[in-house]
Amino acid sequence: LISDRCFAGADVCATSHTLSQGIRQSGTYDLILCGKQTTDGDTAQVGAETAEFLGIAHGANILEVLETGDTFVTVRMNLENKIQTQKMELPCLLTVDKDVNTPRLPSYKRRIGMDLGCIKVMGLDDLEDRDPGHYGLKGSPTQVERIFPPDKKTDKEIMEGTGRELAQAMAAVLRKHKFI
């Protein structure tokens, strides 16, 4: 668990830096699993950027883990237009959607036997990079001014036709609105 007041207000970059520092401090790893995105910023960028800070491969939108080995993991990932099967070398980081797995609740006996004292809490002083200017709001190259839902628009147009016809129609709309 990484927790310190100086981590507050972090954007994607500062959050990813914080996570990578905590992961490095935790020791060796083979596979890091991250959720696809958060409910606050909803950017789906923290996992990939954390992997970049760690210098390891990453796979996004993982639908299923097909095979694991000592040095690799084979996954199915959603690339929006197609589903791709990819064999990735370990260590790597994968971002998964909430539907990739349904976690089981521990049994009563197992809950009684859990050692909750084994959860280590790390703060700024426990990390390799102890510069508070690299974390939280101070370490964030971007700052959110405000978050709001977009206005609902009812003036949408659905176009049908061949690729050429659609391209011509789209160009006409862009010209009409002086985008081109």
Short names for language-model regions:
Residues L1-I180:
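N-terminal glycine-rich FAD/FM-binding segment characteristic of electron-transfer flavoproteins
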